[in-house]
Amino acid sequence: MPRPVAAATAAENAVITKATLRAADLLEITARTLALVIGVSEATVSRMRKQEFLLERGTKPFELAVLFVRLFRSLDA
């Protein structure tokens, strides 16, 4: 059985991954450009879309994705 902290971290990883993809879609940003923005490969973005890969807290791509989502939110306000 997963520990509550581990479950919360997994949920946070899923939320940031989904929010990043949604923001990119709404801003009409291609997978190639998103990959450059968050510092992953285009194949990784494809795996993110298929829910086969989640951004992990504490990694550089996760932090860049958080900034990207914040940027989207400020533009959308």
Question: Model-found features: residue ranges?
Answer:
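Non-transmembrane "mature" sequence context
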Residues: M1-A77
